Every structure is written in structure tokens, then in C-alpha cells.
Amino acid sequence: MTIQPFTMSAQTSGNRFEAGKGTFLLNGEPFVVKAAELHYPRIPRPYWDQRIKLCKALGMNTVCLYVFWNAHESQPGVFNFEGQNDLASFCELCKDNDMYVILRPGPYVCAEWEMGGLPWWLLKKKDIRLREDDPYFMERVAIFEEAVANQVKHLTIQNGGPIIMVQVENEYGSYGINKKYVSEVRDIVRKNFGEVTLFLCDWASNFTNNGLDDL
């Protein structure tokens, strides 16, 4: 078996990453994802580069990161992607360090973060059903995912960037069974991020409850 050598020094648009039969494929060659988990809002910005370099020194080739909705949209329609919240710059730093990125934009992320990343103001609508195919919730999810994509969709691997995969929701099987909701989130993510590889993350014991054929 040939393992794709890790380098992004010559990375250009037109690259591709996909799930093959029993292995991931980077430009058609088997690729082993060795991922570290780094959450940029939790790390002071002056230390971002150092933390990424430490992960690479440990033998990692990829950074997984959550996008915390309530960190970026503290009020409806008011977005902050600057300073500590500069998602694009963090992804660019990963690329500068020859690290790929797995993006996990929720909408729910858990991560021992307040409301799993969901904004508090969603609860002002008394009858809202969070993490369900509730019309208002899905409307706000669509707005948020579009805002995130506008920051980093140019950084997907197809566009010469480091983002190889984007996660849909997070461990939803531990919360409920609603394939309609999961499929709606998938469609929103697909619409905004294009042809990047999408995936679900769930416990094996309940993965099939919400699993979709293309995730």
C-alpha cells in the first residue's frame, strides 16, 4: 500500500479528499488522518501558531475544530469573525504549518461549551424545538452556516485550502432520532460548502438511527 506523503507545499485547487473502501483517499491515494483537537476560541490568539506546531511535532497531520455558534453570533444577525473568533486566519495558520483541517460547524457541537454552542437568544422563542426540524431553528441554522461558509469555503481542499471534511451536527444519536432534521442540516451544509466531503460523528451503537446513505 502506498501512503500519500504529507505535504501541502504544492497544494493547488483541484485537489480532492474522499472516503474510499476502508480508507480515506487524498488525490486518489490512501491517506491516514492523524488529528488533534484544537478549539481556537479557547486558545489565546498569540498561541495559535505554537499550539498547531506542537500538534505537528507530535506527529499529527490534521486539526479538528468546532465552530461555536454562540461565539460568532451573540445577537441575531450580528456576526463576529475577528480577533479571537477569526476562523479563517486559524485555518490559514493550519495550512501554513502543513496541517489539514476537519471543520465541525454544528449547529450543536457539545464540547463542554455553554448550550453546546447554541446561542442563548434562540430560547427567546418560547416554543422553539432545538436540534429538531423546527422552522425557526432551521432558518437560523441556515443563516449561521452561510456566515461560516462565507469565511472559509475558499479554504476547502478543492479550492487549494486545508479543509478536507466538514461534519454535519454532532453525536445526534445521543440526543434523538430525526433523519429529517439531520438531512436538512446536511443539505444546508452542502449548499454552502460545495463538494467537500461531509460526515456524521456518532456512537456506533446508535449511528444507524440517523445515518444517511451519503454520510
Please provide the spans of the model-predicted regions:
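Active-site neighborhood of glycoside hydrolase catalytic domains
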Residues: Y136-D214
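Residue-level preference for long, well-ordered alpha-helices that form the structural scaffold
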Residues: P44, F79, G83, L130-F137, ...
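Aromatic-lined substrate-binding rim segments of carbohydrate-active enzymes
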Residues: W48-E114, W120-L122, V185-V196, D213
